[in-house]
Regions:
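Extended alpha-helical solenoid/arm regions of large eukaryotic scaffolding proteins
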Residues: 1-466
């Protein structure tokens, strides 16, 4: 509103969004007809200019990546760069007008060059050959994309045009004869036209990863997670892209993600692997050093999340806390069951729901044995009730175990059932003198002589009289 309107007969339009820095100033450039002549109308904020161009054309406006600038390409092949803050700057001229022209970064920072595709399929930037046998091309603010006669779409970062790192090209197969129409970086999509004329939208992995890495660099972990879920990207990338920043901001990550199901998904996908060295290698592999302490990666992340969730709201994050315990390497089932045990005494309904969830994560028989190893019959009964176990099997067993006395003998029977013979011997040694002979036999049977010496080390009955 209140913006001067350009003449109605448009030829070409370039909208470059907002000038950098506050206040955000929209910049627009329009080619329009003025009688038999062509005029260039530009506006950046409140500054408006209007000038007639020399010649009949053709003319073309070209956007400049990562900039509010634009370029004007005329019928003679000349390319002129226009900027809201600088005077018009001529670039290296082309031999003739080129309908497929893009402006790319040049070798020196802050300079630009015109790129084009020649009749023989060569992709050129000024006089430098970027690719051969290219059938179409385009660029985004970060990527140069082209298709080849081998029916592949190729992707390289624009930074390779200003520096000479050993970057790797990424590619994906496309349908035979596909041509690029446009790339939409915000949607992570590449629009292709098929030989039969129809348009198809694809979501190439390089464009998706480019957006995810950008979100992670801006510490927008919640957005990065949503994009990763939508495009089935390994969630380990959220940590592996920058481990230090991730571990230092776990409370912030919880606030951004918030939904416990998404937190559970993130924790469940953790593994001791650096995906930036395997699945999603960076453009320049030399910039990435091997991750330190890779074998403890999962445990470090789980510990940080446990600390943050327990401090924030343990009840709300209960399922995520259980997930963090069982995802450790090795899994810490006992700590997870202790959390469950705490809620059994305060909120049985919540404890039952949590029990169903942890059984979903872990084999029920394994959890049942862990609960028995904790010598808690109520916990073992709860797990057995939520599992497919037959009550005719576990109810008499638990009743029999609970009836054994004294407590040390009861725990001996439990550990013996679980195959923990060293612990069983220690309990049997404490069960009283009436079980001493049985303990000796048990020690010999399982060859636990060292454990026997420890168990009876302070019992004077086993020492000779002076």
């Amino acid at each position: 509103r209140g913006t001067p309107q350009p003449p109605p007969r448009l030829r070409s339009l370039s909208i470059r969004g907002c000038a950098p820095g506050p206040p955000h100033v929209p910049c627009v450039a329009v080619l329009c007809m003025e009688g038999e002549n062509t005029a260039l109308w530009t506006q950046c904020g409140s500054d408006t200019s209007y000038q007639l161009l020399d010649g009949q054309g053709p003319w073309r406006l070209v956007s400049v990546p990562n900039s509010t600038s634009f370029a004007l390409h005329d019928h003679r092949g000349d390319v002129t760069l226009f900027s809201p803050t600088l005077k018009p700057t001529p670039l290296d001229p082309l031999l003739s007008f080129c309908p497929t022209l893009h402006i790319l970064p040049a070798e020196h920072e802050g300079t630009w060059q015109a790129s084009r595709r020649t009749a023989d399929g060569s992709l050129l930037a000024a006089h430098r050959v970027l690719a051969i046998v290219a059938t179409s091309f385009t660029c985004t603010d970060h990527l140069l994309i082209w298709t080849t006669h081998a029916h592949e779409a190729m992707f390289v970062p624009l930074t390779c045009l200003t520096t000479t790192p050993q970057v790797s090209q990424l590619s994906r197969r496309v349908e035979r004869g596909s041509r690029i129409v446009t790339a939409v970086p915000s949607a992570m999509s590449l629009v292709l036209q098929m030989p039969r004329g129809n348009l198809e939208t694809t979501y190439p992995r390089p464009m998706v990863l480019d957006v995810i890495r950008d979100r992670l660099d801006r510490l927008a972990f919640g957005e990065a997670l949503r994009v990763s879920r939508a495009h089935r990207v390994d969630l380990n990338l959220l940590h592996d892209h920058c481990p230090t920043a991730f571990l230092e901001r776990v409370p912030e990550i919880l606030a951004q993600i918030h939904h416990v199901d998404h937190i559970n998904l993130l924790l469940s996908n953790l593994r001791n692997e650096d995906v930036t060295q395997s699945l999603y290698r960076p453009w320049d592999a030399s910039t990435r050093a091997p991750m330190a302490h890779l074998d403890t990666k999962v445990n470090q992340i789980c510990d940080r999340f446990l600390e943050a969730m327990q401090a924030a709201d343990e009840r709300y994050y209960l399922s995520s806390i259980l997930t963090a315990h069982v995802r450790k390497v090795p899994a810490d089932y006992e700590s997870g069951l202790r959390v469950l045990l705490k809620y059994m005494h305060t909120d049985m309904a919540l404890a039952e729901e949590a029990c169903k969830y942890i059984i979903f994560l872990v084999n029920a028989d394994q959890l049942y044995h862990v609960a028995l190893g904790m010598y808690d019959f109520e916990l073992a009964l709860l797990i057995a009730q939520q599992s497919p176990r037959d009550p005719r099997e576990y109810v008499p067993f638990l009743r029999e175990m609970r009836a054994k006395e004294p407590l040390a003998y009861q725990r001996f029977c439990m550990d013996d059932y679980l195959g923990r013979h060293a612990k069983a011997l220690a309990w049997l040694a404490q069960a009283g003198s009436e079980h001493t002979e049985a303990a000796m036999t048990y020690m010999v049977q399982h060859k636990l002589f060292r454990e026997g010496l420890v168990a009876w080390a302070k019992d004077w009955l086993f020492y000779p009289s002076p």
